[in-house]
Structures are given as structure tokens and as C-alpha cells.
């Protein structure tokens, strides 16, 4: 086939040039200092680009080259021409990596996980979204409960709704298994004014970009409890896919 000898010649020349460059960068035989370098806290030791000596991994936006490699556990790669003014190489996030990190644990793109018993989350393109598993986060309390509140029941993951009458006496009973509270209240008069009541806004459904936060409130024209939603924006999403680390959320 025409052009094949030229292609083979170019490929051979490229391999020879590459081997010469690698020979200049990597010392032969491999010799390393007796004591490994002292890295800053949280920075691991990794093998250099020659696979010879251990060096401190370079972190996000730090300069990098053949011998000083980026931290692979954080999905960082050395990007040439990404330094100031388009010169030099720096460590940036790998755009092809859709994994996410939550509470120090890494999950694959599309993997589902439970950071706690109350939510089910899914790793999605470098971020993650979560759905509530407790019915109290979705189901409203009874309509005849003027001041509902949620209490944490010993031995149970999900809190439960109870009616708080305030100054009005309420009948409470304690279950034998633990101090579970349930209140029986007298229905309020139809002419009595219903006080405004609402829970705090819940966390945003996303870690970056637009999401939805919910709360339970009776602040509407019918003065009835309903689930209200509003848009939320925790932070803008990075142009490159990144690892989401939400260590304080759960």
C-alpha cells in the first residue's frame, strides 16, 4: 500500500526520539535517597514518572512534570500548557472521571450508596443526588394537628410526627420498648385561628447546580399543611467533572 514505508519510518523515528527523551529524564540505574521526602499533611507518597523513587504527590493547580506526578487518588492529571499564561503544566481534574467522593469514600459513576439510614444517594457524573427514605420527610402529618413536630424515637432511624399542643394539655403515653411519645389532642375549634407553622428548609437535592429544597408548612391560602419546594444553588458546577466531597453533610 502506498505510503506504508513512510509511515513505518515516521513511527520508528518517533519511538527512537521518545526513548531518548525518557532516557534523559529517567536515570539508569534507578537510585533514590535513603530517606523518603517529608510531605505536607494529607499528601501521599507516590512513585515518580520513572517508576523509580517515591515523591510527594502534586495537588490541584500545583505544577507538575515527568518526575513530579499528580495525586492519582484524587483523579488529577498533569495538563501541559495549563499553567499561567499558557506555559508549563499543572495538576487538573480528569475530565473523563465521573466518580465522586463522600465522607472519604469513593464511589463509581452510577453507583448507589447510603451515607446513613435516612437517605439513598447516587453518584452521577462527579456529583451526587439523594432521596429521603423516611416517610416523615414525604408524608404530611394529620390535618387536625395544629402544631406538628418530629421527634427522634430511640431505636429507630426515622423521626415520627407528634402533635404539640403548646399550653393545651395533651395526653402522652410511653411505650414499653422505650420512651416513644405519642400525643392524643383535642380537635381545635373551627373558629379558632390557626397559627403559622413551618419546618426549616431541608438540604438541597444536589451538591452543585440547581436543585430543590423542601419543607412542610401551613402558610398558604387554605392554611393547610403541604410540602413546599423552592430552587436552591449550593454552588456552580465546575466546567470539568470533579470529585464531590461532602464530608459534613451526613
Curated annotation (Swiss-Prot):
Covalent S-S links between cysteines: 22-50, 26-52, 32-53, 39-56, 64-78, 70-100
UniProt cross-references to InterPro entries, sorted A to Z: CCN (IPR050941), Growth_fac_rcpt_cys_sf (IPR009030), IGFBP-like (IPR000867), Insulin_GF-bd_Cys-rich_CS (IPR017891), TSP1_CCN (IPR043973), TSP1_rpt (IPR000884), TSP1_rpt_sf (IPR036383), VWF_dom (IPR001007)
GO MF term set: heparin binding; integrin binding
Glycosylation sites: 196
Main location: secreted
Signal sequence segment: 1-23
A biological process term (GO) from this entry: cell adhesion
Domain IGFBP N-terminal: from-to ranges: 24-103
Domain VWFC: 98-164
Family: Belongs to the CCN family.
Name of the protein this chain belongs to: CCN family member 5
Organism (species): Rattus norvegicus (Rat)
Upper classification of the organism: Eukaryota, Metazoa, Chordata, Craniata, Vertebrata
Gene name linked to the record: Ccn5
